[in-house]
Amino acid sequence: MSSRRVLLLAAFFLSGLAALIFELVWTRLLLLSIGATATAVGVVLAAFMGGMAMGSALAGKKRVARLDPVVTFAALEGFVGIYALLSPPILDRIASVARPEIQFLLALLALLPATIAMGASLPVLVRAFAHSDEPAAVGIGRLYAANTAGAVLGPLLAVFWFFPTVGLRATLWVGASIDFLVCFGLLLAKRRLGLGPIEIEDLPGESASVPLSLLATVGLSGASAMVYEVAWSRTLSMVYGSSVYGVSIMLATFLLGIAIGSALTARFLKRRRAGVAIARLAKALVLSATFAFVSLLVARSLPFLFLNFYSSFEGSAGTLFFSQFVIAALVMLPCTMALGATLPLAVDALPKSSDLGGQVARLYSANLAGSALGALSASALLLASLGIEFSIRAAAIAALSMALVLLARSPKFSIAAGAVAGSAILLILALDPSGGRAAKSFGIYSGARAYARLDVGKLRELVAAHQLLFYRDGPTASVAVMQIDRFRLLKINGKTDASNGPGDLQTQLLIGHLPFLAIDAKRVGVVGWGSGMTVGAVLKHPVERVDAFEIEPAVIEASRFFEPENGNPMEDPRLKLVLGDARRELRRDEGRYDLIINEPSNPWLTGVANLFTLDFFEIAASRLTENGVLCQWFHLYGMSEDSTRSLIATFRRVFPHVVAFKDRDLILIGSRKPVSISVERLNQLYQSKAIGDSLARAGLKYPSDVLVSMRLDSRGVDAFTKEAPMNTDDNMRLELRAPRTLYRDDVDSILAAMRKHRPDIVSHLTDMPSEAWVRSELAASYFTSGELDAALENAERSVALTTSFEGQKLLGQILQQLGRKSEARAALEGALDAGGDPEGRRFVEAMLRSLSSPTGS
């Protein structure tokens, strides 16, 4: 291969790398502005593909063909780089537009200039490659492979290196620098390339047009590829989670298959033989459709395969990411390699013309237009209406049908090949692809630390023991409800997001009740519906209106299985359900809330992570009344201490006064004014039968049980989070760091670090009947929960204030549990001196006898 071609291939490789970097950054910036709904995602993808299709079509004009291809390509790259640097303010302004349809239109228009330039690059470079005796399909296959190979590196370098190093927006400078390198490098090397303008005249008697069948084929290939990609992305999120790393690995693997397929096709294509090219193209469609359907069958075993990998990587992030690549490759590579072959094969089937660039432009434009249609229809329509499996099946059948049409029109029609394609259609129609939903919905990846102790047989039995009550592939997530014994679990993309188990039940109810200790809220916003328990808890209070924001309609459907626990909040006229992206809705809503509860609890999940940033907390704060409160829930499990400190510090930056409650599930309450808790109000809440019963159901039988769940106050937060960095939309700190520690168990060490800064709860209480009584109640609750140090401190302070039988008895019990026998005996004797009822005295006397016995402790 000549040095000229090597240089052009290298330039196109770098162009693909920069293009995918831009796509990732622009997609994230746009979704932050217009919301991360399925329609928004589809619109952004379609805007990219559609803009590139327009660019390719424009590049096919003879007016463009007469330009110097190297200079034109260099200019296109330079323009894209400049536009990338200018784009952030343009994209940011879209957020201020209220109407979503106008936002979508503006997003499309904002991307058009750059994507048109990107789409024009392949047809332009094809003309530079025309100076060769090499078959056109070979050169174009190599070009396409080089560009796609660069695109493979784009998401990997962006997520694994550029985002963590320089942040989201500065990554645009990295991409722009690559484009500028290509631009100026080509211009400087132009003399060595020896290329100039090309005269375009059709060969005598031959047409420069492209057969409609070829346009339809590459268009359908592009559409089916995007349907597969969207469906596979959802499938893989149920197998190994949807962290930013998993998503980038999935995208890179998808593109890798296309690059390999195109490169191999270019390598093995021979000289033209009449009719053979069409047959080869049809066979590529048959292979892609067949492998797509086979991927559904393979996916059934992938959760168990992931667990096998987990046992070997033992928490290593690098091995985890490699296992994600292997799993993604098993699903996608065979099909995408066949898809990668379609464009070179279609070029090979073109009629001869002196304007090869124009023909390729039309083909490439049709392929990209199909991709745009496939992306939009899959994201906004197919997955929600047909589901994952049947969307893939529909796309596969369409591809096979097109293959039959091509075979029938081919001069070298093969009965055998036609029979294979027809049989494949019948087989796909006959087989039910929806098997394995239970295994995928079970979410083996999320509990891998526990499940790794089981052999595969036992694990399969455990999965089978979970009855699948509900399953729906929604626009943004796959939602399931599973039941084992009396426990029901809400699964979103395989991860348990809610359940009626004791731990989850307590947290879901508590975040609906706890904020009312700080404010008598009348208008409340709840971000995330989940099981509906939190909204149900809020509605037990005398609120005037509750706005509940949920992005996934299937979650609302699934919540009906939790009506015994949530009280069917949908029937309450005070509730307004808002289906959409909460962040976007809060930004455009001019109303004010006394209380906002942010229920999503997983900072490592893509699409959820932007609800834990400084930017979101500022948006939420701007929608609170002067005395308003934001309540934030997040899990400690799977979080490192550094990530936990960063999240709390970010919350603290926005809210001057912060109190943290609970343990493995941490609940933050933030306000502009000091957070104080009225003991009188707390008792009144418990006196309300509906609220008291709800709290008791959550395992909080007494008011003091709520109080002792306080872990940090503002002073403790400052000490715990000292010098912790902020988590922002731009640095993506939590989204990038949390997935790396997902399988670590740092909960105990985090809680131990927090205990060093345990607050004096009494200092945050008002309307106390007496401090001695309150401290005695706190000591009792601490004692019950096993926090003996805190129990002892409050019991001693209670006794120091007032000597009472109950106070002395409790102090003696705590000291006995701590093994301090002599001090326990003295406290219990003090209880007897203080009086007490007969039954209580008998209990104390029995304890004293136990302490006096040789085995007493």
Residue ranges and their predicted role:
Residues 769-783, 809:
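Alpha-helical tetratricopeptide repeat
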Residues 1-684, 688:
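Alpha-helical transmembrane segments of multi-pass membrane proteins
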Residues 773, 806, 839-843:
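Start-of-helix register in tetratricopeptide repeats
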Residues 679-771:
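SAM/dcSAM-binding transferase cores
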